[in-house]
């Protein structure tokens, strides 16, 4: 079973400067529409070859557009031995719906 976090809880953890890594697994075209500040851009299909960029010793919140792909990514990472991954319930849609910050990607 995949652990999840909602937008409000994640926002509070980030405001409290907790050590949380955000990973945006959407496509570059989706990311171009905006992303959660300070998220690592790691398209879902690249996770198996870039897994070393995801730490096992801190909480990692994975998100996509609606939460479905990120749920699958969390399940995959858990199978690979990652115990501290969380799915952002509702994805960036829920994040935006709550009026939380979205920024343009760098570069």
UniProtKB/Swiss-Prot annotation:
SUBUNIT field: Monomer.
Active site: 64 (cysteine persulfide intermediate)
Function, in words: Sulfur carrier protein involved in sulfur trafficking for oxidative dissimilatory sulfur metabolism. Component of a sulfur relay system that starts with the sulfur-mobilizing rhodanese-like protein Rhd_2599 (Alvin_2599), which transfers the sulfur from a low-molecular-weight thiol, maybe glutathione, to the TusA protein (Alvin_2600); TusA serves as the sulfur donor for DsrEFH, which persulfurates DsrC; persulfurated DsrC very probably serves as a direct substrate for reverse-acting sulfite reductase, DsrAB.
Pathway the protein takes part in: Energy metabolism; sulfur metabolism
Matches recorded under Gene3D superfamilies: Rhodanese-like domain (3.40.250.10)
Assigned EC number: 2.8.1.-
Domain of life of the native organism: Bacteria
Induction: Up-regulated under sulfur-oxidizing conditions (at mRNA level), i.e. when grown on reduced sulfur compounds such as sulfide, thiosulfate or elemental sulfur.
GO MF annotations, alphabetized: transferase activity
Phenotype seen when the gene is deleted: A mutant strain lacking rhd_2599, tusA and dsrE2, although not viable in liquid culture, is clearly sulfur oxidation negative upon growth on solid media containing sulfide, and shows massive accumulation of intercellular sulfur globules.
Organism expressing this protein natively: Allochromatium vinosum (strain ATCC 17899 / DSM 180 / NBRC 103801 / NCIMB 10441 / D)
PANTHER family membership: FAD-DEPENDENT OXIDOREDUCTASE, PYRIDINE NUCLEOTIDE-DISULPHIDE OXIDOREDUCTASE
InterPro entries xrefs: GlpE_sulfurtransferase, Rhodanese-like_dom, Rhodanese-like_dom_sf
Biological processes per GO annotation: sulfur compound metabolic process
This protein's GO CC annotations: cytoplasm
Name this polypeptide is given: Sulfurtransferase Alvin_2599
Pfam families in the record: Rhodanese
UniProt subcellular location: Cytoplasm
Record keywords, A-Z: Cytoplasm, Transferase
Domain Rhodanese: 16-104
